[in-house]
Amino acid sequence: MIKKYSFVNHRIVLYLILGCVVVCGVWYSFDVRQAIDVGAVDLSLPRMSNNLLKEVAVGEGKTTNRLSRLPVDSTVPTVLPQSLAGSIAPPLPLDAYGHLARVSAVRDFFDYFLTAQNDLTPAALDELVTHEIVKQLHGTSAQVEAQDVWTRYCAYFSQLVKLPDLGMVLGDKLDFVAVQRALDQRASLAVRTLGDWSEPFFGAEQQRQRYDLERLKIADDQALTDEQKKKRLVALEQKLPSKVQEERIKIQQQQDAVVKIIQLQKDEVTPDGIRLQVVGLLGPEVAYRVAEMRRQDEIWQEKYKHYAAQRVQIEAQQLEPKEHDVQVENLRQRIFTKPGEALRAASLDQ
């Protein structure tokens, strides 16, 4: 049975996520940076607890293990690995004097390549990064600076796996003292290996992790009532810098919009109805795109319904497998004329 809204839901969610990336100027690299839920407060907070634990449990980190254990008898790949195929490396930012700017975008550049760590040996990864640095900054002082930062970043990862396991889980709960100690160790390591670059690389991340840890402590405090917990959580959030608060509000609005859109689709609201209801959350341009995707999906559903009816007629002929496949493929090509439509129909036929 085909789920009517599965494709458009997926596309809308992707569109919203990509929109957030463009607006915020952030390159999300999920193998490198574990995401922490920033949604509405759940007083039990089980998922946030798990995510924070993943961030500080460095002994099992894919990035650190990968960089430290693979052989080095490899050369730079002649083509981009599959994980980077079809993409372009982010630009390395410069300041007004031509030096490498001390901003988080430099880490975004390196993390872009680290998404390919499972496809390359450390030596090949190093060659790939060096090649792109030269390509972007050849002959400048920023080239030397970028190479030095990359070396420091790799040193950070190589030392990260050597940090002791602090036993951050007691039974089925987090040991908040151990988690705090682990965060302190990572912050200290970042300063030792990256120096002045530790702040642009990890400052915001460390602030978020410590904030999430404080939320967990409040949520876990059995001496507090639910009302007291909510008040303390609000007070804690108000201590965040205004820019961080604004970003959290924006992310929450986008999450709310995704939930609302999915519900509107389940309720079979028209595309224009969806646009009117989400324009306040997303703005007119994105709301229009969402409505247009919904409209195109309705057109697709009608096409597929027509195609499925004709395919049933082919099935009823009990043809030889080869002849059956030829006729079905011809039917697809005749009905689905836009790029990717025939492939989508074939996937639904499985």
Swiss-Prot record:
Protein name: Lipase chaperone
Membrane topology: Single-pass membrane protein
Residues spanning the membrane: 12-32
GO biological process annotation, one example: protein folding
Membership in a protein family: Belongs to the lipase chaperone family.
InterPro entries: Lipase_chaperone
Classification lineage: Bacteria, Pseudomonadati, Pseudomonadota, Gammaproteobacteria, Lysobacterales
Record localization: Cell inner membrane
Coiled-coil regions, chain positions: none
GO MF entries: unfolded protein binding
Gene Ontology cellular-component annotations: plasma membrane
Pfam families, per the entry: Lipase_chap
Cited function: May be involved in the folding of the extracellular lipase during its passage through the periplasm.
Alphabetical keyword list: Cell inner membrane, Cell membrane, Chaperone, Lipid degradation, Lipid metabolism, Membrane, Transmembrane, Transmembrane helix
Organism: Xylella fastidiosa (strain 9a5c)
